[in-house]
């Protein structure tokens, strides 16, 4: 049983439409992921560089941000790198019992 030429072109047109619809779905899925905040590692590195470029108080080496994103375990690092990651005393020097410290609304509200 042979198909005529008209039926063959119809099948090819349907196949082309299906392929185009699949490409469109893939494209919109990628765009939706970006809008929801799901980024590839390279997109994440680019956005990190763009954000940190405008912070005058934070000197960033670009190699740190473009590298692979991984969690750092301080216990596994050498002593010199572990001490660099720890906060200084003035960064976290506060009274744990003073819950409303620095909250202007709570200080004058009652």
Curated annotation (Swiss-Prot):
Highest taxon above the source species: Viruses
UniProt entry keywords in alphabetical sequence: Host nucleus, Host-virus interaction, Inhibition of host innate immune response by virus, Suppressor of RNA silencing, Viral immunoevasion
Record has Protease as a keyword: no
Biased composition (Basic residues): 23-37
Organism: Cucumber mosaic virus (strain FNY) (CMV)
Residue numbers covered by motif Nuclear localization signal: 22-27
Any one biological process term the GO annotation gives: symbiont-mediated suppression of host innate immune response
InterPro entries according to UniProt: Cucumo_2B
Summary of subunit composition and partner proteins: Homotetramer. Interacts with host AGO1; this interaction blocks AGO1 cleavage activity to attenuate RNA silencing and thus counter host defense. Interacts with host JAZ.
Protein name from the UniProt record: Suppressor of silencing 2b
Subcellular location: Host nucleus
Annotated function: Multifunctional protein that plays two independent roles: viral suppressor of host RNAi (VSR) and viral inducer of host attractiveness to insect vectors (VIA). Acts as a suppressor of RNA-mediated gene silencing, also known as post-transcriptional gene silencing (PTGS), a mechanism of plant viral defense that limits the accumulation of viral RNAs. May directly interfere with mobile silencing signaling. Also inhibits signal transduction by the phytohormone jasmonate, making the infected plant more attractive to aphids, which are the second host to play a role as a dissemination vector.
Coiled coil regions in record: none
Region feature (Disordered): 16-45
Any GO CC annotation of this UniProt entry: host cell nucleus
Homology family: Belongs to the cucumovirus/ilarvirus protein 2b family.
Classification of source organism: Viruses, Riboviria, Orthornavirae, Kitrinoviricota, Alsuviricetes
């Amino acid at each position: 049983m042979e198909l005529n030429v008209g039926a063959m072109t119809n099948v090819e047109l349907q196949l082309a439409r299906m392929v185009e619809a699949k490409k469109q779905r893939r494209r919109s899925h990628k765009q939706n992921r970006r809008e929801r905040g799901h980024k590839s590692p390279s997109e994440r590195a680019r956005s990190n560089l763009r954000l940190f470029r405008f912070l005058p108080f934070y000197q960033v080496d670009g190699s740190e941000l473009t590298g692979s994103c991984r969690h750092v375990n301080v216990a596994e690092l050498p002593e010199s790198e572990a001490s660099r990651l720890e906060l200084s005393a003035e960064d976290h020097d506060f009274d744990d019992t003073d819950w409303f410290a620095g909250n202007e609304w709570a200080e004058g509200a009652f």
